[in-house]
Amino acid sequence: MSDDEDMMYDDDEYFDDDEDQDQNDSESEGVEIENQYYNSKGLIDESIPDAIKSYEKVVDLENGEKGEWGFKALKKITKLYFRIGDFDNMLESFKKFLPYTKSSASSNYIEKGINSVLDMVSSSNTIELDMIQKVFDLTLKSLLDTKNERVWFRTNLKLAKLLFEKAEYGRLAKILRDLHKSCELEDGTDDQKKGSQLVDIYALEIQMYTETKNNKKLKDLYKKALEIKSAIPHPRIMGIIRECGGKMHMAEKEWEKAHTDFFEAFKNYDEAGNSRRIQCLKYLVLACMLMLSTINPFDSTEAKPYKNDPDILAMTNLVMAYEKNDIYAFEKILKDNRKTIMDDPFIRMYIEDLLRNIRTQVLLKLLKPYTRIRISFISKELNIPSSDVESLLVSLILDNKIRGSIDQVNQQLELDTAKSSAYWKYTSIHKWANQIGQLNGGINNKLVS
């Protein structure tokens, strides 16, 4: 072997040794960082401040490389500061954590890490909303910088849901505008390719307008949400949209439309395994009674299994009393089941309508054999004050459901069915004759011209 060959061999051997040494050093550093991380974890139960310092050393050992262990350590530091209520330092450590999300780690891994922090602050009752908003704002800015649109959308949606739960409708409206903008084409119309995102936005917006009772906006959004065909929304989302639609129709006393929507909402919640199905079933029963349907809502295949559910049983009994026009039983069920019926603000809004319906049915049946009846007697039968009886009678007379008049002096209702029958027959014929006369006059005028 020549001297040159010897030299070449020695150089190669030296280079290989260096590579092995570098690899060993790297592995050694990796082991050291990993050990430091787990040592820090062991300090949490003993002393959180010491654990924080130990986790900070993990970050220092990475020498600015922003690796996996630094990502985990800063996430832990953020959570530990939160645990001890030091929210200012929590925010500072979170600021240091966010640049690690720009690393080569997978999007799912990053999203999981971010969500663990966001869920932590969102579910707390000890941290102020302004601080929570700062955490979200920092996250959203970081996600925009990295052009991670999918996670940005989901994070914004998470913030929007939180603001809805806290009834912060002003802040929520701004977030919803940003979300809408992200799903628009250049001409400002909805990008139908983003159907799933649009349905999520509409569902949240519909809930907001339901709570604020803005039926004008609600109608438009409800229609738009149902028109989206480019996505198959999660049944829970459709349950939300349909439930809000039912409430919208109830506000306008469109009982049949409300019944349809509540039934669809119930089915969707049931499919999703969502506990909201029970509440929607109650609303379905409510709408069914208000529309004076003769069909028992529990006769349907979907609702039948819940007929004897403890939370539904009171509504089942209410339907039975309602169908029998048993006022005393109806009122007793309401009184005995305040928690499952009357404590729901939405149901409570329509109890008077139900009572009016059942009182009307009992009253009309009560009046059949009489031509004259005392208001005090009706009051006793309906279990309401005489003043309420008078109001109900006036309303029914104006609606042409009762043909008679109230004698205020003797406090009685006088019915004149024979006269009324002839009167109404004459009125109908007279109205029909007038309409024919107007039509005939219009035709003659056209012929003359």
UniProtKB/Swiss-Prot annotation:
InterPro entries the record matches: 26S_Proteasome/COP9_Components, PCI_dom, WH_DNA-bd_sf
Disordered as annotated region, ranges: 1-32
Any one Gene Ontology BP term: protein deneddylation
Listed GO CC annotations: COP9 signalosome; cytoplasm
Role noted for this protein: Essential component of the COP9 signalosome complex (CSN), a complex involved in various cellular and developmental processes. The CSN complex is an essential regulator of the ubiquitin (Ubl) conjugation pathway by mediating the deneddylation of the cullin subunits of E3 ligase complexes, leading to modify the Ubl ligase activity.
Keywords: Cytoplasm, Nucleus, Signalosome
SMART domains in UniProt: PAM, PINT
Species: Dictyostelium discoideum (Social amoeba)
Name by which UniProt lists this protein: COP9 signalosome complex subunit 2
Cell location: Cytoplasm; Nucleus
Record keyword NADP present: no
Similarity annotation: Belongs to the CSN2 family.
Main localization of the protein described in the UniProt heading: cytoplasm
Subunit structure: Component of the CSN complex. The holocomplex is comprised of 8 subunits csn1-8. In the complex, it probably interacts directly with csn1, csn3, csn5, csn6, csn7 and csn8.
UniProt keyword Cytoplasm, yes or no: yes
Name of encoding gene: csn2
Domain (PCI) ranges: 251-420
Pfam families registered for this protein in UniProt: PCI
